[in-house]
């Protein structure tokens, strides 16, 4: 920790921003004094379809959000690189992110990184609160 400042790191793809992303980032920001967001690189998104919006545009959109103090692109080769560089006190995961909290904490410790991992389990209750739902609706109604 930097003095009394708590740095929180949120991670994600953030393809087609929606209220679910905002809730995740608001809840993450509430855990500390500073919110740093790591936006996934296009090439690294393998657990779901590749993003529709290119990484540079997703980074720009996330950077513009008022609850975000800083946003960076993730590393192409090492997911722990931004963690080493930015030294967060807390790393948050969204309710639907595939990574296991215990596994992540173990991997952090192996690398001498002491960040606590917190799952933001709250979900935004709306019809179009996932990028997948938005894409499906566009395909159904506009194509």
Curated annotation (Swiss-Prot):
One of its GO terms (biological process) is FMN metabolic process. Its cofactor is a divalent metal cation. Coiled coil: none annotated. It catalyses: FMN + ATP + H(+) = FAD + diphosphate. ATP binds at residues 13-14, 18-21, 96. Its EC number is 2.7.7.2. It comes from the Archaea. Transmembrane segments: none annotated. CDD domains: cytidylyltransferase. InterPro entries: Archaeal_FAD_synthase, Cyt_trans-like, FAD_synth_RibL, Rossmann-like_a/b/a_fold. Pathway: Cofactor biosynthesis; FAD biosynthesis; FAD from FMN: step 1/1. The keyword Membrane does not apply. One of its GO terms (molecular function) is ATP binding. Belongs to the archaeal FAD synthase family. Homodimer. This is FAD synthase.
């Amino acid at each position: 920790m930097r003095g009394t400042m708590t740095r929180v790191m949120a991670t994600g793809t953030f393809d087609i921003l929606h209220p679910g992303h905002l809730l995740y980032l608001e809840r993450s920001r509430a855990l500390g004094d500073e919110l740093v967001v790591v936006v996934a690189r296009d090439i690294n998104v393998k657990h779901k379809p590749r993003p529709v919006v290119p990484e540079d545009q997703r980074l720009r959109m996330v950077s513009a959000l008022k609850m975000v103090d800083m946003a960076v692109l993730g590393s192409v080769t090492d997911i722990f690189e931004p963690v080493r560089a930015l030294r967060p006190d807390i790393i948050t995961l969204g309710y639907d992110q595939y990574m296991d909290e215990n596994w992540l904490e173990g991997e952090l410790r192996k690398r001498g990184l002491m960040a606590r991992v917190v799952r933001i389990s709250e979900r935004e209750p709306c019809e179009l609160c996932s990028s997948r739902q938005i894409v499906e609706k566009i395909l159904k109604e506009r194509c």
